[in-house]
């Protein structure tokens, strides 16, 4: 896909050619701007200041890579499984881009050995490798564009490390997915058993409810407590994706919980004002979600036009 002849010639005259070769072995092509890739490997615990005084780490690239990765995997899955319904495609994509899978892939390609971080941070962040993988995809997108991202995922990741047929048949663990989302975004999630009864055949049934920041995310029923929690988590994930009102409520609740205790005490002494809990922050977070969706849509549209 890529012509590396000119890049190889330039490489002979570079002092940092070892870094270029390291990324070439991982990506299958040479970086144009290696500094972007180096930033993708810089954890926030070792942030550095730019000439303009802005802190540099891989968080912004992780944000971008998360969106691009969703689009690329959706593109690949859509074309691989012709005739399959939207639900099947969504679930298959979710299994590939979930944090557990990304952590494993990062280790498989040796990305974990290149991440720069403090020793203390490594023991407290089990998602560091997966986050760096997303940041790497963001770096590829900025440096080489969407086609390079798709090439990387198809030929360097999915080909060697992921069996699409097998992973498409794997059952989705909605509860784990919700907990993973909550941990990454620092939301409090709890499951409560509401009722326990029997159906007409005297089989035990359970109804559970999931609460996100104390707000009901959904209810689910099943023939075991575990199954009812899975169904409730599935409803909550749907709300997180599609219900803007629910998103605004849980962001406001999270903001109120994270306020310093003295500020909460002062606000409690004043008359209540509906919707007055730091709306700027919640709107900022919501705008971030809108940007993600916009990037995904634009990237998918571009990909389908290029491959039409």
UniProtKB/Swiss-Prot annotation:
Chemical reaction(s) catalysed: Endonucleolytic cleavage to 5'-phosphomonoester
A single BP term in Gene Ontology: tRNA processing
Key word Glycosyltransferase present: no
InterPro entries: dsRBD_dom, RNase_III, RNase_III_dom, RNase_III_sf
Active-site residues, record numbering mapped to chain: 66, 134
Gene3D superfamilies with a match to the protein in the record: 3.30.160.20, Ribonuclease III domain (1.10.1520.10)
Quaternary structure (record): Homodimer.
Protein family (similarity comment): Belongs to the ribonuclease III family.
Function statement: Digests double-stranded RNA. Involved in the processing of primary rRNA transcript to yield the immediate precursors to the large and small rRNAs (23S and 16S). Processes some mRNAs, and tRNAs when they are encoded in the rRNA operon. Processes pre-crRNA and tracrRNA of type II CRISPR loci if present in the organism.
Name of this protein: Ribonuclease 3
Species name: Phocaeicola vulgatus (strain ATCC 8482 / DSM 1447 / JCM 5826 / CCUG 4940 / NBRC 14291 / NCTC 11154)
Taxon lineage: Bacteria, Pseudomonadati, Bacteroidota, Bacteroidia, Bacteroidales
Gene (name only): rnc
């Amino acid at each position: 896909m890529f012509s590396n002849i000119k890049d190889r010639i330039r490489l002979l005259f570079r002092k940092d050619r070892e870094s270029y070769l390291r990324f070439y072995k991982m990506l299958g092509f040479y970086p144009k701007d290696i500094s972007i890739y180096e930033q993708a490997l810089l954890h926030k615990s070792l942030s550095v200041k730019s000439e303009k005084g802005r802190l540099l780490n891989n968080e912004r690239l992780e944000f971008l890579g998360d969106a691009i990765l969703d689009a690329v995997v959706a593109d690949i899955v859509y074309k691989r499984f012709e005739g399959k319904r939207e639900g099947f495609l969504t679930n298959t994509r979710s299994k590939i881009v979930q944090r557990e899978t990304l952590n494993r892939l990062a280790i498989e390609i040796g990305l974990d050995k290149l991440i720069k971080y403090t020793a203390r941070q490594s023991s407290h962040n089990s998602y560091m490798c997966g986050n760096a993988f997303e940041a790497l995809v963001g770096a590829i997108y900025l440096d080489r564009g969407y086609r390079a991202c798709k090439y990387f995922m198809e030929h360097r990741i999915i080909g060697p490390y992921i069996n699409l047929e097998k992973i498409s048949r794997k059952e989705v663990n909605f509860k784990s997915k919700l907990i993973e989302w909550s941990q990454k975004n620092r939301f409090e999630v709890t499951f409560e058993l509401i009722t326990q009864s029997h159906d007409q055949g005297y089989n035990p049934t359970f109804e559970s409810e999931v609460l996100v920041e104390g707000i009901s995310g959904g209810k689910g029923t099943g023939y075991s407590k575990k199954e009812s929690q899975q169904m409730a988590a599935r409803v909550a994930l749907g709300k997180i994706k599609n219900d803007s009102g629910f998103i605004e409520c849980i962001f406001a609740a999270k903001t109120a919980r994270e306020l310093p205790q003295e500020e909460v005490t002062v606000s409690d002494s004043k008359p209540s004002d509906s919707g007055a809990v730091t709306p700027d922050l919640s709107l900022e977070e919501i705008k971030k979600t809108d940007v993600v969706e916009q990037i995904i849509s634009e990237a998918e549209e571009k990909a389908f036009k290029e491959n039409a």
